[in-house]
């Protein structure tokens, strides 16, 4: 195997394309136009990617990878990263030596402009000489002394021949002077001064020497080393290993005949054919004018050398600009690279349920816009809050590397696990349960944020109650996913109607019982089945009737309707949950027209925000969130309070701002005092302790105070504000200080364990215990009451007691830290064991159920669930609407989460989503992303579809039209820019 062409799995990382998947292929080093390049070929075919190596290598690393195998990692100057794995160690080492030589020549390029090509020729030639006869190797070994002597002299004639024509003939001459094999050449090129001096000649002299020495070399050396071959082709080191000696001799004979006759058929066809071949214009390629070299035959490539100076239309023009930094600027990728830009999420250990749900939520463009584009103050939100972790992952998912993305995924999982412990391990979980938990937690975080802004000051604005009261941020869950259903209970005796309203984030619908003669039922049938009228036992307060009828209608529609299809049934005899594999048709459109009234409110338009509803912000917020928050929940649990008001006031020299800060502190003290009086009457002493101070400040006023007195007052009030917080429990505090924004700084934050706050709690132990302060104060008071002398003995006793307390606290701290470390290690070990056990069980159950993964085609088993019956006209209208969406209140399919497996307790989740920006469907299977047709989604997921996302047709059309206009505008701007340039 040629050391300059190695094979193995390849992965490439660049700023433009991200990180690609491991693909089988090869690295091939070629030299062309005195530039060394790396050509990446994939076994699956396609356009090879070409990376310039000359003056472009940043780092080369070789690591072991299995028995007698290695992984070669190459980093370029633009931070592009290339890896090839499972390469034989010998070949990988030779490739590394060559790349190191290229890298070292880059360092000396300023003083030795021609050193690069010269040393490359010496290296490549010496490598070639290893494949010569043993006579040459023994001859080289016997010339050690002469080699050293030649290196000490300044006679550079042999090396000029190397520069002129780095063929085997020239290397043989160099071997006569003692040049060692390939593995020792890199050190010589970097340390030998005579070698460097021998390389100092300009390109014109080299070309003349190459042309003049051709006939001499033909007479002195074997035919396969004939220097009359293409100079340009023979400077390419990799081509010397493409064919055997026999093939080389045949090709050279043919070239000799062509040159003698004056005809160049191979040259013309290969050269001009290569111009029409596909070129690699990918952003990661630095040589845009390189052709597909591997597609040419050796004879065709060698025949190029007979042209004195080949001049394709763009080679010489682009060659001068190869080092121009503008080539590395991000460009709009072609359609062939769209799939490389899309990256999935790594499976952290049975977390396919989380990956599928997150991909579906992130694909909702209106949901993402409401989360990211309303100016939410992320620095005010704790680091471990789900909404902050969620938004951070949404922003970084398409631009960060896989390791960073995996870390962000862990933080999202930890944020949810902190509230719902069932998601903390690595066991399999239900995707619908995760979706419900995620949406509820996002709602709570937004409510906490809005409550925080009611009491937090707004820097730069006047301190008026109206401004703080009207600052409301839009909850993306409420505006996009939440809807309201009105249940009307109608007494069948007197007709009394009792309305009740309920908010939902999604609907869990039953599978309709399929009748054998009829075709399969659809999602539309299941939805209509949910809203059918039903009878129930109900005691009427007006007439005493015991029977009533319940009707369900939409009171407010969502932008996106989420439908959860109940694909499970409970087997009473076996006490097992079974998955139902019944076929259910997935329509492109479904309609809610039969479940709406004339009073039904349409979805929020895309321009709506909570700030527009400032006339009644509190009522609206309480109404839509009434189903989530219990009234008994203390308000202090909803405040993400960042105590920065003091810092804000001290940073300004304005007296008005100081007054405003003091007034704010007063209001906070009053609020905290009133809460304490209402909760516990026995704590009146604390509030009374604050009241005299407030009255004194109020009576004294601020007009007559100097700036220093105002600062002192602010500091005093701030200290009193902070004193009650010492008695609060740790869970009332935010898990971490929200002092960084997710978009810029979170990616650089120190490693942390967001799922617990144990790492932060020891910090509070170092502070003096409040109990110790109480005891010390009590002793001091007793000394005062008993009139203890204030001599040195009292001071010594006090200091001894304080030292004893501090020593005891330090011991407790050390014990707590040791215990915490032990518990952490035990928890990590248990977590690893759980992961291994869960993975084994998951694989075992999945393999057992894979044969039956298509499920059964029987009835749903829900005997009380009847099939919907339509008239012939209604059925025809619904069938037509499923393709066109012409009926009012129609919704368009945009995502499907599917469960693969025959049982409800094990399996695998995948997600199909419609990308509005690319106007195409994609399948996300953990880390793998593939393009799929909508018809395939509808047909392939009819037995496994579990959760369905439908977007209101008008909202969908508006988003699609906006995206098309944006793309058209970008194209027009691009054309104008190119015309101007």
Swiss-Prot record:
Localization per Swiss-Prot or TrEMBL: Nucleus; Chromosome
Motif (KEN box 1): 32-34
Ranges of Low complexity composition bias in the record: 183-200
SMART domains, per the entry: UIM (SM00726)
Enzyme class: hydrolase
Span of the annotated motif KEN box 2: 223-225
Domain USP: residue ranges: 343-953
Domain UIM: 706-725, 808-827, 830-849
Modified how: Polyubiquitinated via 'Lys-11'-linked ubiquitin by the APC(CDH1) complex during late mitosis, leading to its degradation. Able to mediate auto-deubiquitination. Phosphorylated at Ser-630 by CDK2 during G1/S phase but not during mitosis; phosphorylation at Ser-630 is required for deubiquitinase activity. Also polyubiquitinated during early G1 phase, without leading to degradation. Phosphorylated at Ser-114 by ATM following DNA damage, which in turn increases its deubiquitination activity towards BLM.
Active site residues according to the UniProt entry: 352 (nucleophile), 908 (proton acceptor)
PROSITE patterns with a match to the protein in the record: UIM, USP_1, USP_2, USP_3
Cellular component terms (Gene Ontology): chromosome; cytosol; nucleus
CDD domains registered for this protein in UniProt: Peptidase_C19 (cd02257), PH_USP37_like (cd13312)
Pfam families, per the entry: UCH, UCH_N, UIM
E.C. code: 3.4.19.12
Its job: Deubiquitinase that plays a role in different processes including cell cycle regulation, DNA replication or DNA damage response. Antagonizes the anaphase-promoting complex (APC/C) during G1/S transition by mediating deubiquitination of cyclin-A (CCNA1 and CCNA2), thereby promoting S phase entry. Specifically mediates deubiquitination of 'Lys-11'-linked polyubiquitin chains, a specific ubiquitin-linkage type mediated by the APC/C complex.
UniProt family annotation: Belongs to the peptidase C19 family.
Protein name listed in UniProt: Ubiquitin carboxyl-terminal hydrolase 37
Source organism: Bos taurus (Bovine)
Lineage: Eukaryota, Metazoa, Chordata, Craniata, Vertebrata
